[in-house]
Amino acid sequence: MVNFTVDQIRAIMDKKANIRNMSVIAHVDHGKSTLTDSLVCKAGIIASARAGETRFTDTRKDEQERCITIKSTAISLFYELSENDLNFIKQSKDGAGFLINLIDSPGHVDFSSEVTAALRVTDGALVVVDCVSGVCVQTETVLRQAIAERIKPVLMMNKMDRALLELQLEPEELYQTFQRIVENVNVIISTYGEGESGPMGNIMIDPVLGTVGFGSGLHGWAFTLKQFAEMYVAKFAAKGEGQLGPAERAKKVEDMMKKLWGDRYFDPANGKFSKSATSPEGKKLPRTFCQLILDPIFKVFDAIMNFKKEETAKLIEKLDIKLDSEDKDKEGKPLLKAVMRRWLPAGDALLQMITIHLPSPVTAQKYRCELLYEGPPDDEAAMGIKSCDPKGPLMMYISKMVPTSDKGRFYAFGRVFSGLVSTGLKVRIMGPNYTPGKKEDLYLKPIQRTILMMGRYVEPIEDVPCGNIVGLVGVDQFLVKTGTITTFEHAHNMRVMKFSVSPVVRVAVEAKNPADLPKLVEGLKRLAKSDPMVQCIIEESGEHIIAGAGELHLEICLKDLEEDHACIPIKKSDPVVSYRETVSEESNVLCLSKSPNKHNRLYMKARPFPDGLAEDIDKGEVSARQELKQRARYLAEKYEWDVAEARKIWCFGPDGTGPNILTDITKGVQYLNEIKDSVVAGFQWATKEGALCEENMRGVRFDVHDVTLHADAIHRGGGQIIPTARRCLYASVLTAQPRLMEPIYLVEIQCPEQVVGGIYGVLNRKRGHVFEESQVAGTPMFVVKAYLPVNESFGFTADLRSNTGGQAFPQCVFDHWQILPGDPFDNSSRPSQVVAETRKRKGLKEGIPALDNFLDKL
C-alpha cells in the first residue's frame, strides 16, 4: 500500500527546511484532482496504471459521482531528490528526502471558501491551467487569493493531449498559446502582488527558471524545461567532454534552459543556437522550444496515433524508453500513454518543480508572519512563527473542520506555525472572537490525539513539530469553524480568513415531522462546523435559515444536512436572496429625535458613500483597526472627505466592521463622550436591521450634527439614548431617498460561436447584460462576460443549456451590490414588492413604517 511508514514521515517532519506545504488550485474542470493522482502515484499510494482515473483525493461518494471536487483534501507525500537536482534549490536544505503536504482544492466558485481554507495552511500553490481554454475567471480569483495570502505560485499547463489530438495545433501555434497563458498569469501576479521590492521578491513565473510545467494529467506525463535541458546537456556531454560534477552540471543545465524558451532559434544544419530567426544562408530557422522540445513529442504522437510500427520502434529505442512486456503489444492511445508516461513521468517533473521552487516553512513564515498574526510583531509568538521554531510556544491555526466516520465528531484540520503539538498537551483554544485578557471564546483543554491526514485515511502520530499540517481530535466541541490553538498565555489570534465570495442565497428549512426539530437544530450546528462558508441563522419568526454562496453550494449543504448531519427528511423553501438597504441622496431635513423622557435630543443626517468606499471597507483597505491618521489621510486623498471629519469616525457597522460609518461633526457638546457608547450601540442595531425591511444597511454615512443632553447623568443612561439614536438614524435614512441594493453575479460563459445568440436571449430575459465578449485565441470558443442579478440566477444554468444545446458552460461569481432601480415608496415599483415580500416573510407589519414614528417636533 504505502511505501513509507509514519515513523519515516515523523523523522522528516523535524527537517523543517525539507517540508513543502502546497495546494493545487485552478478553474473548475482544468484537471486538479487528475493531476494530483500522478503525484500520489509517484509516492506509491495508488497503482500507476490507475493514475489519472482514480481521483484519489475525491473522497466523498458525491464527488466521485458528480466528477467534481467539493471539499479540499490533504495528503502527505515523501519524495527523494537525486544528488544532481539538489543543486537547483536556492534556499536552505537538509538531506535529500522531502515531505510534501499536498492539498487538492475544489475549482467551483461555490466552494471557493474551501480554497481559502486550503491556502491559509500552505506556502506554495500549483496553479493548473487548461492550455486549450486558457486563464479563466476562477483561475484569476484563486490566484488573487493566493497572492493576497503571500503564497508563491508555480504554473502547470494541463491537457496538452487535447491540444495535440483534438485541436491538432502546429508547434509554433502551441508555443504562442503557452506564451499567452504565461503572460496572462504574470499580469494577474503583477497586478495583485507587491512587486520585486516586496518581502517575497520576484514571484513572476518564467519557463526559463523552471517554474512552468507542461503536460497531461490524464495521460500521466509532464515536463519542465529542466527535464529537456538535462537530456540535451547529457547528449552534448557524451560527445567528448568528461563527466561533470553535480554543481557544474547544474550550471550547464541552467544555461541550457535559457536557450529553450523565447525568441531563441536552432539551426539543425550545424547544431548551433542563434538569436535571429534566419540563418546566415537566409533560411527561416525553427524556434528552439518547437524544434528541441515539441518536435520529439509531436513525432511520438504522430507515429503512435497513425500506427506507424517501424517508426514507433525506432523512436522508442532512440529515446531509450523501456516498456514492460504487456505494454509492447498495445497500440493507439494505450501505447501512447505507456510511452509518454515512461519517457516523461508527471510525478517526477511536478515533484521536482515543487521541491525546487516552492518555499519551505522556514522561508515562507518570515514574510507571512505579519499577515498571519494579529498581535505585536515582536512578542514570543510572533518570533516563534517568524523563525519557525519547534522550541517556541505552540501557535497553530485551525482552518477547517473535517467530519469523521463517527457521526457528529470532527477532526480539527490546521497547521502548526511554531512549537510542537503532541497528544495530551494542555492548550488554550481561542475562537475568532477572543480578545487577549478576556475570558470569552477561550477554553483550556488537553488535545486527545494528533493524527496525520492521508486522503481517505488517517494515521495516528505522537507529536508534530512546526511547519506541518495536522489533524487534532478532541477540540471540535470548542470551535465552530476556525480558531487558534496555543500554549502562550499572551498570544493574540491568528488573523481570520477573508473569503472572496459572500453567502447571498438563503433557504429556509424545517423538519417534515415536527417531532424531529431537536435533530434538525443539532444537524444545523454540525453543518455550520463542516463548511467554512455556510451561515445557519434562526430568524425571529423561528425559521431556520441556511445561507450559502450559490445554488450548487446550497444543494450540497442540504444533501449533507439530510444524509449526514441531521439524518431526517427535510422540507426546504425556494431560495431567497439577501438585499441591502442604502440611501441615494443627503437627508433633506436635519432629523431630530427626543429620548423617552424628553430631556435629550439628537440631530442627525444620512448621506450616501462615494463610489468604491463600501468595497474598500469590504476588502479591509479601510477598517476600524487602522491607525487613525493614516485612515483619515486615505479617505481625504481618495474620496475627498474633510480631514477633520475623517478623523472623527466613531465606528463602522454592523458588527463593528461593516460598510456604514458614524461620524461626529458636532461642535463643543458637553458630556458627549459619556453617551458615545450608547449612540454606537444604537447605530450597530440600526445598521443591522434597516428601516425598510430589517435587512443590513450598506454604504450609508451618518453624521451626528448636534446633541443636547440633560445635565444630570441619571437622565441620560443607555436606556434613554440607545432607542433615541436608533429612531434618529431611521428617520435620517427615510428622509434621504432610501433604496434597496441587490447582489449581482459576474457570469463567464464559454461557448462555440454559433450559440452566442442564444446566450443573449437568456440573459435579456433575466435582466442580465453582457459587458464583454472575446474569442479565445487559437480556438473556436467565445467567452461572454455578463452581469446577472442573483435573484434571477436560479435555474439559469439549466435554461442556458437548453437554449444552446448544452454547449455553453456558465460560471457565476458574486461580484458586487447594485441599487435596484425604483422607489420603495411607490407601490408599483420592483423594490416595493421586494420590501413587501421580505416584511411578510419576516413576520413584520405590512408597509414601510411612517416617518412620524421616528421624527420628533421641537
Curated annotation (Swiss-Prot):
Domain tr-type G: 17-362
Assigned EC number: 3.6.5.-
Catalytic activity: GTP + H2O = GDP + phosphate + H(+)
Positions carrying Phosphoserine: S325, S502, S595
Post-translational modification: Phosphorylation by EF-2 kinase completely inactivates EF-2; it requires prior phosphorylation by CDK2 at Ser-595 during mitotic prometaphase. Phosphorylation by CSK promotes SUMOylation, proteolytic cleavage, and nuclear translocation if the C-terminal fragment.
Residue location of crosslink Glycyl lysine isopeptide (Lys-Gly) (interchain with G-Cter in SUMO1): K239
Residues bearing the modification N6-succinyllysine: K152, K272, K572
Glycyl lysine isopeptide (Lys-Gly) (interchain with G-Cter in SUMO), cross-linked positions: K322, K529
Entry keyword Nucleotide-binding: yes
Residues carrying the site annotation Cleavage: E586, S587, K605, A606
Positions bearing (Microbial infection) ADP-ribosyldiphthamide: H715
Alphabetical list of InterPro entries matching this protein: EFG_II, EFG_III/V, EFG_V-like, EFTu-like_2, G_TR_CS, P-loop_NTPase, Ribosomal_Su5_D2-typ_SF, Ribsml_uS5_D2-typ_fold_subgr
Keyword Ubl conjugation found: yes
Top-level EC class as recorded in UniProt: hydrolase
Modified residues (Diphthamide): H715
Signal sequence range: none
Keywords annotated in UniProt: Acetylation, ADP-ribosylation, Cytoplasm, Disease variant, Elongation factor, GTP-binding, Hydrolase, Isopeptide bond, Methylation, Neurodegeneration, Nucleotide-binding, Nucleus, Phosphoprotein, Protein biosynthesis, Spinocerebellar ataxia, Ubl conjugation
Any one GO cellular component localisation term in the record: nucleus
Function: Catalyzes the GTP-dependent ribosomal translocation step during translation elongation. During this step, the ribosome changes from the pre-translocational (PRE) to the post-translocational (POST) state as the newly formed A-site-bound peptidyl-tRNA and P-site-bound deacylated tRNA move to the P and E sites, respectively. Catalyzes the coordinated movement of the two tRNA molecules, the mRNA and conformational changes in the ribosome.
Family of the protein in this entry: Belongs to the TRAFAC class translation factor GTPase superfamily. Classic translation factor GTPase family. EF-G/EF-2 subfamily.
Clinical condition linked: Spinocerebellar ataxia 26: A form of spinocerebellar ataxia, a clinically and genetically heterogeneous group of cerebellar disorders. Patients show progressive incoordination of gait and often poor coordination of hands, speech and eye movements, due to degeneration of the cerebellum with variable involvement of the brainstem and spinal cord.
Protein name: Elongation factor 2
Classification of source organism: Eukaryota, Metazoa, Chordata, Craniata, Vertebrata
Primary gene name: EEF2
